[in-house]
Design a protein with these regions (language model features):
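Short, charge-patterned binding micro-sites
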Residues: 55-87, 117
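Core RNA-modification/binding signature centered on pseudouridine synthases
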Residues: 15, 150-229
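Helix N-cap motif at beta-to-alpha junctions
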Residues: 88-93, 137-140, 193
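Short, low-order "capping/linker" segments at domain edges
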Residues: 120-139, 172-174, 227-229
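Ordered, amphipathic secondary-structure segments that act as subunit-interaction surfaces
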Residues: 79-132
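Extended, well-folded interaction surfaces typified by the phenylalanyl-tRNA synthetase beta subunit core
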Residues: 19, 24-26, 30, 34, ...
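Charged, low-complexity intrinsically disordered regulatory segments in eukaryotic signaling
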Residues: 2-15
Length: 229
């Protein structure tokens, strides 16, 4: 007896269940010098080594069903990186966290595993990004704070021979200075991903240029929180 023909595009009744899981991780120390695309490659190779059962895309170029958060600028540390992967079976979150941390390189650490995970509807209002900016000099930190909080602070970005002018505008929502031992922290809240609003990466690069000979006092940038607006 001939088998019934499956119609193109129709899902099989026996299609495996899929379980979306969010992995939150940090990038610190030397890992902050790993570029975004290299980070993706490291994580995908780690998942393959673990022989984790995950869903894949359809079509000619099969790849894991995985998505990543916004790129982290090179040289910035972060405690709020993440990726969302679709697994073929419900994970044991603690075992998955431990297994990933065993395989990932130094400086990359899984902080938590969230399951089940439901994607939020992405709006078009951009992102709020919180940073800790580290300084070895109070005077330099205060100079940075004043520049960041001035909406009229201006800078240029030259890319592929084209010059574009920016102002801080509404990109910096707040910047508060606190003492940390012998150093100083600038807790800054940024908005990015909106029209004519410069990214944090562009602002921080311009800030270092503005500090001029004092730029060496500005020694570490940490992304500590990220949320969609």
């Amino acid at each position: 007896m001939p088998m019934p023909r499956r119609l193109p595009g129709r899902k099989s009744m026996n299609q495996p269940a899929e379980y979306k899981t969010r992995i939150n991780y940090s990038k610190t120390r030397q890992a902050r010098y790993i570029a975004h695309l290299d980070t993706i490659d490291i994580i995908c190779k780690t998942l393959r080594r673990m022989q984790l059962s995950y869903a894949v895309t359809q079509g000619c170029h099969v790849r894991p069903k995985i998505s990543f958060g916004p790129p982290l600028p090179l040289g910035h540390a972060s405690f709020c990186e993440y990726f969302v992967i679709t697994l073929c079976q419900p994970p044991d979150v603690e075992k998955l966290k431990s297994a990933l941390n065993h395989e990932l390189p130094q400086g990359m650490e899984v902080l938590s595993v969230e399951f089940p995970w439901a994607d939020k509807k992405s709006g078009s209002a951009g992102e709020q990004v919180d940073y800790r900016l580290h300084f070895s000099s109070r005077q330099t930190a205060e100079q940075a704070r004043i520049w960041l909080l001035n909406p009229e602070s201006a800078f240029q970005v030259i890319r592929k021979g084209t010059t574009r002018n920016y102002t801080i505008g509404k990109a910096v929502q707040k910047a508060e200075l606190t003492e940390a031992g012998n150093n100083w922290l600038l807790q800054a809240e940024f908005i990015q991903g909106q029209a004519d609003v410069p990214s944090v990466s562009k602002i921080v690069t311009a800030l270092a240029a503005h500090l001029d000979t004092s730029r060496d006092d500005f020694y570490l940038m940490e992304r500590i929180a990220l949320k969609e607006l």
